[in-house]
């Protein structure tokens, strides 16, 4: 028997840690291992301790925990053809974009304010809008201030890797536990198509020479991080016709050098963003092309499939950016940190994630044991917590799962414009949603109206709210059983 539903949304909307814990305890916990680590059986305990509350390094954790980025590092030492940094932009959702640059003191003020209001917060990252290692003094000063005030928060940086080797020892000394390196090539001939120039050793390099230096520094930095036990995630931008097939080789190289995760992301090439690739017509991959590459990389370095390509000032759960709520004009001038609400939230999560893991593993095993050749591509509307708990019309993205002979796995997400605006459905938005759901067999959501349901059906996509508020994997297992006539894994409520 599973635990009664505890709504994470209602918990995080409470005003005090006491209310949060009272709500959690009223829900109870039926799992015999309530409060344990929920560690996957295929992972050692030391690694699990590092990732269990890091939403970017753990697909399971991203259902429960939030990250925030502080824009303290605007300077950059390379130019990428897919990047155009903007420092006062509120309406673009992509890396390299922020609403405002921060000093280390302003960053501390903002982090404390967010930690007091967002109990899911577990990670502070510096991801630009330039490069965290090149703009090192600001990165270091920010981490030192935050670690002194909120010692339990995980510290994380994202870097292009060019200046990484000279700072690895200091990163280890400051207990920076996770580092992301963007590596798009291991062949300089490919790299020169992506990077017009780099700035290294007080001079500018171009062409193959630039790409060769960048490659060597990236590999050295990765090896140094691995040797010091710092977990690394490799980000790669999939650029059709430039490096798409080459990323298979990149995956091999980074796995050999100890990368924990490889995150292959689609190129964002909207001309309105002003990037070189966008302005010259270089297209990004569609969702099916990205999935095909992900499938080819199975068996190599472990893949991250839940990346949202966040802004450099993102705040909140992945897929739910609350950054505009916490610009400097919205946060107190001198906030005082109170960790009680964050601690209470962690106790809540400990009560429910074991139940989720038990249901998830049972569902995956049930689908795999059915040994059915067919597969289902399922899009899910969710607010987090591992449940189908979002109204179709309110969804800003759909998480995509595949049920097949190997079980159930998360394979990506599709961003959309919400169908409902002010209580009314928008036909243009629905057309965009249907296009975004290309290749999907069925949509699972908490609620859906007859009109969008019928329009989806006309496009060959079924939708149902039958499994509303069930755990995602358990619902997919039950759905799979219905589709293929096998014994179901009972969906949990």
Swiss-Prot record:
Pathway: Cofactor biosynthesis; Fe-Mo cofactor biosynthesis. It comes from the Bacteria. Its EC number is 4.-.-.-. Its cofactor is [4Fe-4S] cluster. [4Fe-4S] cluster 1 binds at residues 76, 80, 83. S-adenosyl-L-methionine binds at residues 82, 130, 182, 234. Binds 3 [4Fe-4S] clusters per monomer. One cluster is coordinated with 3 cysteines and an exchangeable S-adenosyl-L-methionine. The two others probably act as substrate. This is FeMo cofactor biosynthesis protein NifB.
């Amino acid at each position: 028997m599973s635990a009664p539903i505890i709504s994470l949304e209602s918990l995080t909307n409470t005003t005090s840690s006491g209310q949060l814990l009272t709500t959690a305890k009223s829900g109870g916990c039926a799992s015999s291992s309530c409060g344990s680590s929920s560690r996957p059986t295929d992972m050692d305990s030391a690694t699990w301790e590092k990732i269990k509350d890091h939403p970017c390094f753990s697909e399971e954790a991203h259902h429960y925990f939030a990250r925030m980025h502080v824009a303290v590092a605007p300077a950059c030492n390379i130019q990428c053809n897919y990047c155009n940094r903007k420092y006062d932009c509120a309406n673009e959702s992509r890396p390299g974009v922020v609403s405002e640059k921060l000093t280390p003191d302003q960053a501390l003020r903002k982090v404390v304010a967010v930690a007091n209001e967002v109990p899911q917060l577990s990670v502070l990252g510096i991801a630009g809008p330039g490069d965290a290692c090149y703009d090192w003094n600001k990165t270091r000063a920010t981490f030192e201030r935050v670690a002194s005030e909120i010692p339990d928060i995980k510290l994380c940086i994202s870097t292009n890797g060019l200046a990484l080797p000279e700072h690895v020892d200091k990163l280890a000394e400051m207990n920076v536990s996770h580092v992301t390196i963007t590596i798009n090539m291991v062949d300089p001939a490919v790299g020169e198509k992506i990077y017009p120039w780099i700035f290294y050793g007080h001079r500018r390099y171009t062409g193959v020479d630039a790409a060769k230096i960048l490659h060597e520094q990236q590999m050295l930095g990765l090896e140094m991080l691995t040797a010091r036990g710092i977990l690394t995630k490799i980000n790669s931008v999939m650029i059709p016709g430039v490096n798409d097939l080459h990323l298979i080789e990149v995956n091999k190289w980074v796995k050999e050098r100890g990368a924990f995760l490889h995150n292959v992301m689609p190129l964002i090439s909207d001309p309105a963003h002003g990037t070189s690739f966008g302005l010259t017509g270089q297209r990004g991959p569609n969702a099916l092309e990205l999935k095909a590459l992900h499938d080819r990389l199975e068996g190599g370095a472990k893949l991250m499939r839940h990346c949202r390509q966040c802004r450099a000032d993102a705040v909140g759960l992945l897929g739910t950016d609350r950054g505009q709520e916490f610009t400097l004009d919205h946060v107190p001038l001198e906030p005082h940190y109170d960790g009680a609400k964050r601690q209470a939230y962690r106790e809540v999560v400990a009560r429910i994630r074991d139940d989720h893991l038990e249901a998830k593993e049972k569902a995956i095993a049930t689908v795999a044991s059915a040994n059915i050749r067919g597969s289902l591509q399922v899009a899910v509307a969710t607010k987090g917590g591992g449940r189908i708990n979002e109204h179709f019309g309110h969804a800003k993205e759909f998480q995509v799962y595949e049920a097949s002979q190997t079980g159930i796995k998360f394979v990506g997400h599709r961003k959309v414009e919400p169908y409902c605006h002010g209580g009314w459905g928008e036909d243009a938005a629905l057309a965009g949603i249907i296009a975004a759901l290309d290749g999907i067999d069925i949509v699972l959501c908490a609620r859906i109206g007859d009109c969008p349901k019928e329009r989806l059906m006309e496009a060959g996509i079924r939708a149902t709210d039958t499994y509303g508020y069930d755990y995602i994997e358990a619902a997919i297992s039950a759905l799979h059983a219905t589709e293929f006539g096998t014994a179901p894994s009972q969906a949990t409520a």
